């Protein structure tokens, strides 16, 4: 694998980890909280953002305005059944969600969840590293590159991996601070 390809793959893993972090509640209303919620719509699981306009009214309220009023009940049901711990209020045209402040216990649970997402991201980075190192070893074995080149490349791959793992650690600590901030 080329260095650029490795970095592209690792950037994708970082982005996926960041998307996971964005779905964790922090006590403030945020439209990305609903990114993981999907709605049963005409027999297919559809992301909520494909069915409605989602906006934040204030720091504690999310507003969901469906493009098709007929799916209002389905959206409400999906939000209620999600693991977000929030209750939707349906007024017949718009669903409003009041995001309650988090309890200390709930904040700690969300910190654990953030740590889990960070670990998944690091595992993905290590898998990319493993694949790249395996390719280097194969090229060395096949005689395409020298032993020294292979070791230099493996060392460079490790440096890139370390850099990206440190980036995930930084993002995790930022997210934990955001979650624990009262």
Curated annotation (Swiss-Prot):
<dbReference type="InterPro" id="IPR002661">
    <property type="entry name" value="Ribosome_recyc_fac"/>
</dbReference>
<dbReference type="GO" id="GO:0043023">
    <property type="term" value="F:ribosomal large subunit binding"/>
</dbReference>
<dbReference type="Pfam" id="PF01765">
    <property type="entry name" value="RRF"/>
</dbReference>
<dbReference type="InterPro" id="IPR023584">
    <property type="entry name" value="Ribosome_recyc_fac_dom"/>
</dbReference>
<keyword id="KW-0648">Protein biosynthesis</keyword>
<dbReference type="InterPro" id="IPR036191">
    <property type="entry name" value="RRF_sf"/>
</dbReference>
<keyword id="KW-0963">Cytoplasm</keyword>
<comment type="function">
    <text>Responsible for the release of ribosomes from messenger RNA at the termination of protein biosynthesis. May increase the efficiency of translation by recycling ribosomes from one round of translation to another.</text>
</comment>
<dbReference type="GO" id="GO:0006415">
    <property type="term" value="P:translational termination"/>
</dbReference>
<dbReference type="GO" id="GO:0005737">
    <property type="term" value="C:cytoplasm"/>
</dbReference>
<protein>
    <recommendedName>
        <fullName>Ribosome-recycling factor</fullName>
    </recommendedName>
</protein>
<comment type="similarity">
    <text>Belongs to the RRF family.</text>
</comment>
